[in-house]
Amino acid sequence: MLQLSLSRLGMGSLTASPWHLLLLGGASWILARILAWIYTFYDNCCRLRCFPQPPKPSWFWGHLTLMKNNEEGMQFIAHLGRNFRDIHLSWVGPVYPILRLVHPNVIAPLLQASAAVAPKEMTLYGFLKPWLGDGLLMSAGEKWNHHRRLLTPAFHFDILKSYVKIFNKSVNTMHAKWQRLTAKGSARLDMFEHISLMTLDSLQKCIFSFDSNCQESNSEYIAAILELSSLIVKRQRQPFLYLDFLYYLTADGRRFRKACDVVHNFTDAVIRERRSTLNTQGVDEFLKARAKTKTLDFIDVLLLAKDEHGKGLSDVDIRAEADTFMFGGHDTTASALSWILYNLARHPEYQERCRQEVRELLRDREPEEIEWDDLAQLPFLTMCIKESLRLHPPVLLISRCCSQDIVLPDGRVIPKGNICVISIFGVHHNPSVWPDPEVYNPFRFDPENPQKRSPLAFIPFSAGPRNCIGQTFAMSEIKVALALTLLRFCVLPDDKEPRRKPELILRAEGGLWLRVEPLSTVTSQLPWDLLAHPPTS
């Protein structure tokens, strides 16, 4: 019988049975893989040496202990931006490098690259997959291109115009609640709580033409969406539950599945009913019927969408895009509006100037309602919105995985396979891009005094081919809500300064609380000294 002599290794003689050979071959393969990984890791580390990095508190944890989801973590990110003004390297543990980009010049090659060159990094986005399916947020490649082309008409001005009335109604409902709460004077309100319900109310009407009255009463569908968002944030903090099969064994995993079922069943029912009506009536009669309501909602547009080959979206695709719109449209807008009101509460001179601009626009108009054409007639209010989006961007970062080497303008190369974090917060707070970046100064965005800045210096909605498709929708809703709020209420800062809390969007620990007073009860005159002498950036 064949024997393999291992006597020279001090192991004596071993009969080379097939199992022994298989074991030896497997061990050799594993060893080869380990050696290949070590070589690849070492080579990658050598290529990353051109990028600076802050001192590591621990060789094992890397910079992980400094990356906190609280105010101190936000201050650390700002500190990094002051010391590393274009790009720097961070380590999550001993073997996982991440490049953080904080300057327009270095983010340009990534944001302007095709989705194939710099696709989204899906480690954390993957948690959303069971809820959002293959919508725009989650899809890639040809499927993303196809969906993006078919969805673009849904955000055309002609469609968005009809949504402005919906925005007005939802804001009016929120303000009616505020009037009741402030009947005896000022009230201390959590902006996130109230504005989130208002944005969900608007979205449900714009997407499904459905009024759940969620601002005044409980809605199973709205409760499920809020629970899904909360569970995803909670799971992000529990790395041992990143594996699906473990997560779905937990109580949170079962709650997540149940909430997904509630959301999917609601969306599926609307799509089935609308598809049946379309098939029964035909396109022409369907459009005539919808024209009587003066609103073509998001589901209608997707049902009617066809590409150049006559191919439309399946019901599963439509559900994914509707759920993605609900997810992406409520929290981000609520965060933006909450921080805008916070900044205006801290700067009453700007708040009053916005209020006078709105009053002048709506003078002698009954009822007091913002119309589509009004949105372009509020320049100072728009400046205040943009400056708040710079200072407190709702989405703090975008992650990309390089599928090939990325050459930066200065000649340095980001090696293939590395994760890049485009820090929107870092770019917006970069002192080499924005002088005095922590100061709230709307005049940075004065259209009559344009600054020489890169178009990528201000990216609250991202940029490039994968920018936010709903940014005009979001800005329209923000303008309507802000204009009507300032017309009816004075917003004052709370006694306690909020502590920022980065999650899926930028929140505040324990809520963002402000004091709200109906304007009819405001008797004291605030000093508007800066109106006559506005600061310059």
Swiss-Prot record:
Q: What keywords is this UniProt entry annotated with? A: Endoplasmic reticulum, Heme, Iron, Membrane, Metal-binding, Microsome, Monooxygenase, Oxidoreductase
- Which compartment or compartments is the protein found in? Endoplasmic reticulum membrane; Microsome membrane
Reactions catalysed according to its record? an organic molecule + reduced [NADPH--hemoprotein reductase] + O2 = an alcohol + oxidized [NADPH--hemoprotein reductase] + H2O + H(+)
Cellular component per GO, a single term: endoplasmic reticulum membrane
Gene3D superfamilies documented for this protein: Cytochrome P450
What topology does it adopt in the membrane? Answer: Peripheral membrane protein
Q: What is its EC number?
A: 1.14.14.1
Q: Which CDD domains match?
A: CYP4F (cd20679)
Could you tell me which InterPro entries the record lists for this protein?
A: Cyt_P450 (IPR001128), Cyt_P450_CS (IPR017972), Cyt_P450_E_grp-IV (IPR002403), Cyt_P450_sf (IPR036396), Cytochrome_P450_Monoox (IPR050196)
Task: Name its GO BP terms in alphabetical order.
Answer: leukotriene metabolic process
What domain of life? Eukaryota
**Cofactor(s) this protein cannot do without:** heme
Tissues with expression: High expression in liver and kidney. Lower expression in brain.
Q: Per UniProt, what is one GO molecular function of this protein?
A: heme binding
What protein family does this chain belong to? Belongs to the cytochrome P450 family.
Q: What is this protein called?
A: Cytochrome P450 4F6
The gene coding this protein = Cyp4f6
